[in-house]
Design a protein with these regions (language model features):
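Bacterial Sec-dependent N-terminal signal peptides
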Residues: 1-28
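Sec-dependent signal peptide cleavage junction
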Residues: 18-59
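Alpha-helical scaffolding within the catalytic cores
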Residues: 45-60, 263-275, 302-310, 349-352, ...
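Loop/turn elements at helix/coil->beta-strand transitions in domains of secreted/extracellular proteins
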Residues: 66-69, 246-249, 276-281, 315-320, ...
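Active-site-proximal beta-strand/loop segments in catalytic clefts of secreted hydrolases
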Residues: 73-76, 252-257, 283-288, 323-327, ...
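Conserved SGNH/GDSL esterase-like catalytic core that processes O-acyl groups on lipids
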Residues: 79-195, 204-302
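Catalytic His-Asp segment of secreted/periplasmic serine-dependent ester chemistry enzymes
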Residues: 267, 328-391
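Conserved, well-ordered alpha-helix/loop/beta-strand core segments that scaffold catalytic motifs
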Residues: 280-286, 304-312, 319-324
């Protein structure tokens, strides 16, 4: 099915192309209810940070020099990876040989939940799963991924393949020759190892970063993580795949049900963020915050203040882009405690908060509520309307 609207990846690409006086690279379908004339990045404050980001993008695209790291952070829509993968595909096709040197991933399916779409995972043995959106889980240390898997099973393995489940003609292929496993053993006696072409490799351990780094003589698209012995436990917090090449890297960080406070509960978020040192962060967190019965704009903004403070400690020059919420539904309890769904009117409050934060932090804003209109306008225009989801 054709996309209802261009993705933010194409939006960024088009804005960048406009600055180069180049034509659009992808046609846009015409829908009467969509406000295409409003489909652009807003700058309520100063645009200097984004201009600096675009200059760095110029160096990568035109000179083949340097790296650009972009992180898209959110909830279930980012964990699913569909939006982020389309963003990645569009952005990496504005030129040639642009696929960057890093790919931060987390093997969600080993914990019994869904993986993003741009890589594949298989696992064996028993793994316990914790995520930042569940308060009772936050006694387990989590990092940038917002999730963790833990095992005491000597037969436990996790295999990761850096290939999209449903690739299209634009989907780039990512190969790597370096792997960094982020994790720890609470019993301090379990070490993860990696299988590479039939050989067992031991990594270099960094106690400060809590990482195990493995380097390969050749490029590959897959690894298997396992344990030679299991006298205790091991918790995996994330995996960084690298190839040392210049280009554009797009990292998706998303957990089902996550809100801004969910990421603030991750003790090792800042530590792990240093590994990718983002140049641009796209904030897609807000749907789950706005679904809370006691949602307040000022609290929402203060939570973002805390998160941005962490980000700017890692990279003070990191550009920020806020995505406002779509129209959405929220669960409410009616008579006799029956659950029903109603339109969440907090979307417009999140929209205003994004504009205010855009001004405060000199950030860009992509106003989805403004450009696509209310749910009643686009409902029934695509095959997902029965689920109240726009494509």
């Amino acid at each position: 099915m054709k996309k209802l609207l261009i993705t933010i990846g194409l939006l960024i690409a088009c804005q960048w192309l406009a600055a180069q006086n180049l034509p659009l690279i992808k046609p846009i379908d015409d829908y009467s209810f969509a406000h295409f004339e409003r489909n652009h990045l807003l700058y309520p404050g100063d645009s200097t940070a984004m201009e600096r980001f675009f200059q760095k993008l110029d160096s990568v695209v035109f000179l083949g020099e340097g790296n650009v790291n972009i992180m898209h952070i959110g909830g279930s829509h980012v964990q699913a990876g569909v939006f982020t993968q389309q963003f990645r595909d569009n952005l990496l096709n504005i030129g040639t040989d642009l696929i960057g040197g890093q790919n931060f991933v987390f093997p969600f399916s080993a914990g019994g939940t869904n993986n993003p779409s741009h890589f594949m995972v298989s696992s064996t043995g028993g793994w316990g799963y914790t995520r930042n959106a569940v308060r009772k889980d936050t006694d387990k240390r989590m990092g940038l991924a917002g999730a963790a898997i833990t095992t005491t099973d000597p037969k436990a393995t996790v295999s990761i393949m850096s290939r999209a489940r449903r690739p299209n003609l634009l989907t780039p292929e990512f190969n790597f020759n370096k792997v960094t496993l982020i994790g720890f053993s609470e019993t301090e006696n379990v070490e993860p190892v990696v299988s590479y072409k039939g050989k067992t490799l031991h990594g270099h351990y960094d106690d400060y970063q809590s990482t195990y780094t493995f380097e390969f003589p050749d490029f590959t698209d897959s690894i298997c993580i396992f344990f030679e012995s299991m006298p205790g436990d091991f918790t995996l917090q994330g995996v960084l795949l690298e190839n040392g090449m210049s280009g554009i890297s797009v990292h998706g960080v998303g957990v089902n049900g996550a809100s801004v406070p969910s990421y603030l509960r991750c003790d090792d978020f800042e530590r792990d963020l240093n590994l990718i040192h983002p140049d641009l962060i796209i904030f897609g967190i807000g749907i789950n915050d706005a679904a809370e019965a006691n949602f307040e704009k000022e609290t929402f903004k203060r939570n973002y203040d805390d998160l941005i403070r962490i980000i700017h400690r890692v990279n003070p020059d990191c550009a920020l882009l806020f995505m406002s919420n779509n129209d959405s539904y929220k669960r409410v309890k009616g008579k006799k405690k029956r659950v029903r769904y109603e339109v969440n009117t907090n979307g417009s409050i999140v929209e205003q908060a994004c504009l205010e934060m855009g001004k405060k932090y000199n950030a860009a804003v992509w106003d989805q509520l403004e450009r696509r209109g209310p749910f009643t306008a686009w409902s029934g225009k695509n095959s997902r309307s029965s689920r109240r989801i726009s494509s």
